Amino acid sequence: MLRRPAPALAPAARLLLAGLLCGGGVWAARVNKHKPWLEPTYHGIVTENDNTVLLDPPLIALDKDAPLRFAESFEVTVTKEGEICGFKIHGQNVPFDAVVVDKSTGEGVIRSKEKLDCELQKDYSFTIQAYDCGKGPDGTNVKKSHKATVHIQVNDVNEYAPVFKEKSYKATVIEGKQYDSILRVEAVDADCSPQFSQICSYEIITPDVPFTVDKDGYIKNTEKLNYGKEHQYKLTVTAYDCGKKRATEDVLVKISIKPTCTPGWQGWNNRIEYEPGTGALAVFPNIHLETCDEPVASVQATVELETSHIGKGCDRDTYSEKSLHRLCGAAAGTAELLPSPSGSLNWTMGLPTDNGHDSDQVFEFNGTQAVRIPDGVVSVSPKEPFTISVWMRHGPFGRKKETILCSSDKTDMNRHHYSLYVHGCRLIFLFRQDPSEEKKYRPAEFHWKLNQVCDEEWHHYVLNVEFPSVTLYVDGTSHEPFSVTEDYPLHPSKIETQLVVGACWQEFSGVENDNETEPVTVASAGGDLHMTQFFRGNLAGLTLRSGKLADKKVIDCLYTCKEGLDLQVLEDSGRGVQIQAHPSQLVLTLEGEDLGELDKAMQHISYLNSRQFPTPGIRRLKITSTIKCFNEATCISVPPVDGYVMVLQPEEPKISLSGVHHFARAASEFESSEGVFLFPELRIISTITREVEPEGDGAEDPTVQESLVSEEIVHDLDTCEVTVEGEELNHEQESLEVDMARLQQKGIEVSSSELGMTFTGVDTMASYEEVLHLLRYRNWHARSLLDRKFKLICSELNGRYISNEFKVEVNVIHTANPMEHANHMAAQPQFVHPEHRSFVDLSGHNLANPHPFAVVPSTATVVIVVCVSFLVFMIILGVFRIRAAHRRTMRDQDTGKENEMDWDDSALTITVNPMETYEDQHSSEEEEEEEEEEESEDGEEEDDITSAESESSEEEEGEQGDPQNATRQQQLEWDDSTLSY
């Protein structure tokens, strides 16, 4: 049977069928069964000022469920399987977010949520997961990828500049040395990266300095440094990091140059000025010992004050030797054999002495000079103890005997009774005993061998002789004789002795009697006398006291200096330091192990001069040191220190004497037992003149000058000398007297001569005032005396400071005898000598403390009354004539009136007192001054009579040629037939 074929389908139907078949297959394939996939590790970089992280590899999540490419255009809005919807970061405090950029491709980025700071945290690590969008429109069954690790590094930005660790740097280098590194400057950078946090270079900004700095900050010198050229360098240094950023603040570097380290004392001044009267002055206030870091076991330092050129070895009071003995407590009776030349003590007048009065009197003996001590100055008995004291400076002049003091026969035998002499470097004392019943050997010569005798330095020698014992003190230290020679006593004789200083006295006999020097002839009435064994050197303060030995306390007082070194160590300093002081106070020795404590002790050493008026000049200072080290092989040595103390010139006092210069006394007072006090109102003061700087800003103003201020001070006096001017004192009729009991209480001695009286001894100005107030002048023949003049001079420190010359003139008032003839007014005074001055100078005299009988004589009183009455009468007469002349109209009337006014003066007798005439002559200047004052006060009265006086004067001029007037003048002449002058 035949079948029929099926009919063909339309094209539209075919397309619909294919779509249905295909659509059913795709839907069947959209199942979300795969997880997204990420790389296991990511590395990222982010910059501080950016928020996007650059990852390697890029952040892309893959999903196998991704739709087909050709179907994407139909299903993009309805299909989610295979797309990536997000990323999730796991970790605490992770400042990053992961954001999907393209869901279909799974691309994403990581961004920072906040500003990153590399300095706080340089890198971060965390995990991240990707998740897809799930399936279906609701996004169910979301798949997550595995956790991938992300490492992010924060890149640095050069935001911080280098900063130096120190605000400044200091270093000390020794001159002349080349250093590889002196010091290191170091800067830091707060940036976190190696590029920006590292310092790549340093630079010295200061130009032209001999230093350089490397990249690590080490500074070194480019040449050897010189302390003399520059003590310190100041450098400015900057730093750069590796990003070429410069430090905002540069740093200052101070490099001090230290002299080449030499062990020694440092911090002392070469010159120290000492102001008199300021007490102790520290001489090394900042001294310290530099040991250059060498280990030292102990240090011994000796400080010495050199004063050998001042006075007799140092500064001492420069009073006379007798006054010094008294001040030191020595008993009275000291005889000064080499006194300062004065009126009564003049045997040293021809000896050369030192210049000036800053030091006491020093006598020079050149081998040809000597002085004989006058008889009666001192006597020595061999049976009594005695003391010889002397300052001596002697050099090594040879082997000849040189005599200091010698007592020998005046004539004939040339025997030496006692003698102190030098022989080489030996001091020898010869003391021969007087004749005695026992003729046996006895000690006669005592020998001392001393370096002090010939070292050309001043030394103090005291010889205490109490036979047979003789003790010698040199500078306060006792010395026993190394040899004693015995001899027989002297033979009996009645020959007088002669005491000589600087040689020995002997009569020339042709044989030199054990003398090794050529004798020098001295002219004498007794024959050819000679000096021998002359001394060459300097002597001062030679004294001899008989009857008592010198105490050790007195000897030390005489030798002790008024200046020296002092060390006052505080309780908290100077521990462990041993201190030794020399008795002379000129040497101090310090020893210790602790250098710090030794330095403190040295800083407290001071110079002190206790004199009110010290001797100005230089006192040299010297420090010598001895170092003991643990290792003697490398022990250091310390050079000596040389400096000086400059004692400034003290303000010189001006001693002023004031009082009554002129006065008169009756002759009876001069002849009385009390006499007349010469200085009843004497005043002694002393002043110094100081410069006072202006106050405020006056020192800056050149127009303001310093003012001088005079201040009164108090000090002692040692001499007051009263001398008579004109003829010397005649002790047979006049004398100067003083209360000796008061003098002994004051400790002031007095000596008198024909020239006057001298008071000596150290005492206050008030004491000298009191003593001089009691000085009296007596004259037993005052009726033949008109006046006497005296001069007073006081001084201090043996003539260093001298007062003004205070002169006093005393006049004698002579009183007439009332028992003479009644007409004594006309008699010639008996006390006026015609060959002498006929007047007594009373001008300017003050009648101090007048007595009832010291008045004008009665004769003179009558004469004065008569003269004054006559003068008043003549004045009244003159005034009357002037007024009458003014009223005259005719010459006849005038003549008549003149005749009426004539008076009979034939019986008038006038006696003139010579004393009054002399007073009038010398007081004319004072009267003229008084008249001028009266004329100025009475000017109006004078004006009233001026015209009358002028008319009267014209008329008187016209009357000069009138014979009648001549007759009248003859009538008015004085009757001086009985006038006495």
From Swiss-Prot:
Stated membrane topology is: Single-pass type I membrane protein
Q: Where is this site: Cleavage?
A: 824-825, 853-854
- What protein name is recorded for this chain? Calsyntenin-1
- Residues of the signal sequence? 1-28
Q: Which residues are glycosylated?
A: 346, 366, 515
Give the domain section of the comments.
Answer: The cytoplasmic domain binds synaptic Ca(2+).
Query: Where in the sequence does UniProt note compositional bias of the Acidic residues kind?
Result: 925-960
List the ranges whose topology is Extracellular.
29-859
Function recorded in the entry: Postsynaptic adhesion molecule that binds to presynaptic neurexins to mediate both excitatory and inhibitory synapse formation. Promotes synapse development by acting as a cell adhesion molecule at the postsynaptic membrane, which associates with neurexin-alpha at the presynaptic membrane. Also functions as a cargo in axonal anterograde transport by acting as a molecular adapter that promotes KLC1 association with vesicles.
Originating species: Homo sapiens
Entry-linked PANTHER family: CALSYNTENIN, CALSYNTENIN-1
Transmembrane intervals: 860-880
The family database entries (SUPFAM superfamilies) matched by this protein are listed as:
Cadherin-like, Concanavalin A-like lectins/glucanases
* A cellular-component GO term for this protein: postsynaptic endosome
- Pfam families noted in UniProt: Cadherin, CLSTN_C, Laminin_G_3
* Protein family (similarity comment): Belongs to the calsyntenin family.
Q: Which GO terms describe its biological process?
A: cell adhesion; homophilic cell adhesion via plasma membrane adhesion molecules; neurotransmitter receptor transport to postsynaptic membrane; positive regulation of synapse assembly; positive regulation of synaptic transmission; regulation of cell growth; regulation of synapse maturation; vesicle-mediated transport in synapse
Q: Does the keyword Transmembrane helix apply?
A: yes
